[in-house]
């Protein structure tokens, strides 16, 4: 392979990126600069710099992207109501563009020849990373070892790491593929690859209790929203990162947001994963219910179509595109009145709306009551039905006329 002077590596400290450091040095005779995007992995970041240097990197950039991640990527996606295939809250999908953008920025500072990532050739993340890089530096060389090297499986990776004394925490028996950030934790591989197998939740779950271990009494919380963003929990104002952290703790305790799904990957195959998204699931539910109170019918119905498209764009790595940006502007406009307070009951994986209020509520008890009211003349419905049903009547009479002619 051609010699390179300096390569920027998207580094997590996991198995893939740990063995890529010696592989790059062996194959390109280059300096490797590791970059870790901190998007809320917490304890996974402990000792990362020491590990990267010990493995062969010249330095490690530890970039704290958590605030930007929550405010500029997570919250706009919540406002959009974007959920991929009805289940996946896009935990990995919207983290990759942000990290990819930062990789390009550091590559320019360092004068690097290439950017390298550890995504497999079967996954979605290779697309997300590389499209982000191309969006900010279309001429940057990208190295994707999984598409080049002789390593064919995670078992091969472990063997490679052991032969080069690369420190790893996993082994052949507990080799789940995981991705963690402040929004979620995903689990893939091993027994999960066969959809007939029930997930071993007591062994897999890290952020959440299983349903069986969740408290036998419900937990009540109150969330306050301003223009579509959660700003307070139980009456206490919080920044976005702190609020999500607190919801993760509360939701995890009550087994909220555990999803087992088979999804359609961008690259053409189906894959199965178990996702833990405790705080995010609470925010989605609260935001959606408050929108029901505050959005008019036409906006609400049209926004459902936008939500589906927005989810596809994010999942497919198209965050930095004119369409995603345009949809975000539309969504931002719809959120101007999504302000209010909602009380939620959390119990063994369930989230129940326990009451909500908003100064922009479009719900009128005077009009909606089943009791006697003085504002709604029910006789007006007759004229409405006559006009609304006119196309149906015209069509029915046309068929009646045709039947008479046939006779």
Swiss-Prot record:
Disulfide bonds: none annotated. GO terms for biological process: argininosuccinate metabolic process; L-arginine biosynthetic process; urea cycle. Pathway: Amino-acid biosynthesis; L-arginine biosynthesis; L-arginine from L-ornithine and carbamoyl phosphate: step 2/3. Its main location: cytoplasm. GO terms for molecular function: argininosuccinate synthase activity; ATP binding. Keywords: Amino-acid biosynthesis, Arginine biosynthesis, ATP-binding, Cytoplasm, Ligase, Nucleotide-binding. It is found in: Cytoplasm. Its EC number is 6.3.4.5. L-aspartate binds at residues 120, 124-125. ATP binds at residues 10-18, 118. L-citrulline binds at residues 88, 93, 124, 128, 177, 186, 263, 275. It is an enzyme of class 6 (ligase). InterPro entries: Arginosuc_syn_C, Arginosuc_syn_N, Arginosuc_synth, Arginosuc_synth_CS, Arginosuc_synth_type_1_subfam, AS_cat/multimer_dom_body, Rossmann-like_a/b/a_fold. GO terms for cellular component: cytoplasm. Pfam families: Arginosuc_syn_C, Arginosuc_synth. It catalyses: L-citrulline + L-aspartate + ATP = 2-(N(omega)-L-arginino)succinate + AMP + diphosphate + H(+). Belongs to the argininosuccinate synthase family. Type 1 subfamily. Homotetramer. This is Argininosuccinate synthase.
